[in-house]
UniProtKB/Swiss-Prot annotation:
KW Oxidoreductase (keyword) present: yes
Coiled-coil residues: none
Key words of the record: Oxidoreductase
GO annotations of cellular component type: cytoplasm
A Pfam family matched in the record: SelR
Catalytic reaction(s) noted: L-methionyl-[protein] + [thioredoxin]-disulfide + H2O = L-methionyl-(R)-S-oxide-[protein] + [thioredoxin]-dithiol
Gene3D superfamilies reported for this sequence: Peptide methionine sulfoxide reductase
Name of the protein in its database record: Peptide methionine sulfoxide reductase MsrB
Top-rank taxon: Bacteria
Database matches in NCBIfam families: peptide-methionine (R)-S-oxide reductase MsrB
Length: 151
């Protein structure tokens, strides 16, 4: 992935640009990852920074990928969003300042949060590709899952 943000932005699809740079929202149930159930991580489409893990993904029946927590809270920024006559908490990536989606206090995890994220803001890296794509440090997340299932 190139280090020049302008070059990376030129590589985005129209929808990816609309979502990440113009705070857009893709259609529910008509996006790449809402129903994906593979093990892996979801990275920022612009910066490539890891944002979410499939281990924290759940079906919120909303039509967008939903997660109970970020894989690295330091890569997430939350901002007040009063657009469209609503009061919500917007979620942005810290490194690329990309709009990702919103976080709501109605999730199933211990913190009760639901990170509702646009697929267009993400790129999925399957567990088996983590090493070769430079995300080897995240393999251990899935090794813990495997050892937890065996005990």
């Amino acid at each position: 992935m190139t280090n020049n943000k302008e070059e990376r932005l030129k590589q985005l699809t129209r929808m990816q640009y609309e979502v990440t740079q113009k705070n857009g929202t893709e259609p529910p149930f008509q996006n790449e990852y809402w129903d994906l159930h593979e093990d892996g991580i979801y990275v920022d489409i612009v910066s490539g920074k890891p944002l979410f893990s499939s281990l924290d993904k759940f079906d919120a029946h909303c039509g967008w990928p939903s997660f109970t927590k970020p894989v690295d809270a330091g890569e997430i920024e939350e901002k007040l969003d009063t657009s469209h006559g609503m009061i919500r908490t917007e979620v942005r990536s810290k490194s690329a300042d990309s709009h990702l989606g919103h976080v709501f206090p109605d999730g199933p995890g211990p913190d009760g949060l639901r990170y509702c994220i646009n697929s267009a803001a993400l790129r999925f890296v399957p567990k088996d590709d983590l090493e070769k794509e430079g995300y080897g440090e995240y393999v251990k997340l899935f090794e813990r899952k495997k050892s937890g299932e065996e005990s």
